[in-house]
């Protein structure tokens, strides 16, 4: 039975989306000032956009806030502390757990105290090399609570990759676990971390390791300490007030050679933009159940497992499993059914894997997905066959949208919370409010509809995008802003059709860099 959203796909659209989009492009400061009223500030910004030093733009420059406060404390303060913040489900281990906003704040405050006891102060870098467990989310939010800059590295990444990130970030502390689990095998983290520490020129002060049950490892005191031990000796601590343009995190892009490329996120713009996206792009409200099936080591995990859903006050699902093999091709349907998930965000690869294992959807028929309203795909090209297969099976809108590690949120999408637009197979829909997207041809002129070229975004980029690279302003300028003056180069090619729909030819490593 088609949902309300799917029915609206068949009707004539009003100009609601166009009005909002046009306003965001013509009056960006007013548009984002309005959005900024929806988050908590210790000191509200009066300077909305500083354009004095392009391409280094600053949003909400004089604002003072805190990422963790907006993710947790604000909801507890508003009387929603008993609402479920995080659902953890691990079909690999059989472990399940729910955490209310109150409980999660308590755990985060305690681990923030533990980090402080290990000498971590505002501005210090903390590397988080963890599997998909609640402690990984706790570590990220604890860093945000005290103003430390986290750098999450995908658990299981090779020692040399981890070493290069230790060296570039000059991290003070590394937080890890004894192991991660893949279907049919255990990935021992300690030897990988030990190898990285040995290879790195910069020496970390401490390693905090979470011992997974049945997979405990020996720690070498005093540099290596257990999670449980440091938490038992810690007190809960409050949020530190942070300037809007201080950094929330560094996320290194994968697959780079030489010095890793550290994408940074400024605090104020990050909170404002991500909270705005939950309702406007994904049609998710406070208390809704949201699931992003990605990994916290990638940008989708940062933005849509951890930060955006918690900023919005909804319930986010943390899934330690795979689309197939944990235990079967019904794993996703089971999660959606068990927790009454409203929307899922994942990569097309996941659905191709499910389709290959269960082309007729036999597993699907075992579960109740009556609360499920929409599926969002990103990270690589969503081929029309996969989209149509998912639409026919799920009977909900299947929305392909496009974004990058650099942007932290969608450049183009069907904005279901504003107005559902017609699907065009092979397109990632229209540019999202905030992004003035153009196609530039090889002769450096702006393309006409349906003409191919490089996809660029007119500067300034909206809040929540990367203001620079970690300790590499010149590289930021040269890599992204120099080929087309006044524009951000996405390094994707494509065309925009006569209706404003963006059609992409993805870069070869897009799936690696966006979603994994």
Role assignments for model-derived ranges:
Residues 438-459, 495-499:
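Conserved beta-loop-beta connector loops within the AMP-binding
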Residues 141, 145-229, 348:
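Structural core segment of the AMP-binding/adenylate-forming
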Residues 253, 456-508:
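Conserved ATP-binding/catalytic segment of the ANL
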Residues 271-289, 299-343, 356-362:
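Conserved AMP-binding/adenylation subdomain of ANL enzymes
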């Amino acid at each position: 039975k088609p949902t309300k959203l799917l029915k609206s796909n068949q009707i004539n659209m009003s100009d609601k989306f166009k009005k909002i989009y046009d306003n965001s492009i013509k009056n960006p400061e007013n548009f984002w000032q309005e959005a900024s009223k929806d988050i908590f500030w210790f000191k509200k910004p009066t300077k909305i956009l500083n354009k004095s030093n392009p391409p280094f733009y600053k949003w909400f420059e004089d604002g003072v806030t805190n990422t963790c406060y907006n993710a947790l404390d604000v909801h507890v303060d508003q009387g929603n502390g008993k609402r479920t913040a995080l659902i953890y489900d691990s079909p690999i281990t059989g472990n399940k757990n729910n955490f209310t906003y109150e409980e999660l704040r308590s755990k985060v405050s305690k681990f923030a105290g533990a980090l402080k006891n290990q000498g971590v102060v505002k501005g210090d870098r903390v590397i988080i090399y963890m599997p998909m467990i609640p402690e990984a989310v706790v570590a990220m939010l604890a860093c945000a609570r005290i103003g430390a800059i986290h750098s999450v590295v995908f658990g299981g990444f090779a020692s040399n990759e981890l070493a290069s990130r230790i060296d570039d970030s000059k991290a003070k502390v590394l937080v890890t676990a004894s192991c991660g689990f893949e279907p049919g095998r255990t990935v021992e983290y300690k030897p990988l971390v030990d190898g990285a520490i040995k290879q790195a020129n910069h020496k970390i002060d401490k390693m905090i390791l979470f011992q997974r049950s049945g997979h405990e490892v020996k720690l070498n005191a005093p540099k290596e300490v257990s999670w449980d031990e440091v938490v038992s000796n810690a007190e809960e601590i409050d949020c530190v007030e942070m300037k809007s343009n201080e950094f929330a995190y560094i996320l290194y892009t994968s697959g780079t050679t030489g010095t890793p490329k550290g994408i940074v996120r400024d605090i104020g713009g990050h909170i404002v933009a991500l909270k705005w996206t939950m309702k406007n792009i994904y049609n998710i409200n406070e208390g809704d159940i949201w699931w992003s099936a990605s990994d916290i080591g990638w940008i989708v995990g940062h933005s849509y497992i951890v930060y955006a859903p918690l900023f919005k006050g909804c319930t986010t699902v943390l899934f330690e499993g795979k689309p197939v093999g944990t235990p079967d091709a019904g794993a996703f349907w089971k999660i959606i059914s068990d927790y009454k998930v409203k929307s899922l965000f994942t990569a097309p690869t996941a659905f191709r894997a499910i389709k290959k294992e269960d082309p007729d959807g036999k597993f699907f028929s075992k579960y109740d997905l009556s609360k499920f309203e929409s599926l969002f795909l990103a990270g690589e090209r969503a081929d029309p066959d996969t989209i149509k297969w998912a639409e026919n099976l799920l009977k909900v809108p299947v929305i392909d949208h496009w974004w990058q590690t650099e942007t932290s949120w969608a450049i183009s999408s069907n904005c279901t919370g504003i107005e559902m637009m017609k699907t065009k197979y092979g397109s990632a829909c229209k540019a999202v409010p905030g992004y003035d997207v153009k196609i530039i041809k090889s002769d450096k002129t702006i393309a006409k509809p349906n003409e191919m070229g490089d996809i660029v975004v007119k500067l300034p980029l909206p809040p929540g995008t990367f203001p620079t690279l970690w300790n590499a302003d010149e590289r930021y300028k040269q890599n992204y802003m120099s080929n087309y003056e006044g524009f951000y180069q996405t390094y994707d090619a494509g065309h925009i059709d006569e209706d404003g729909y963006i059609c992409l030819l993805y870069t070869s490593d897009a799936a690696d860099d966006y979603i994994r």
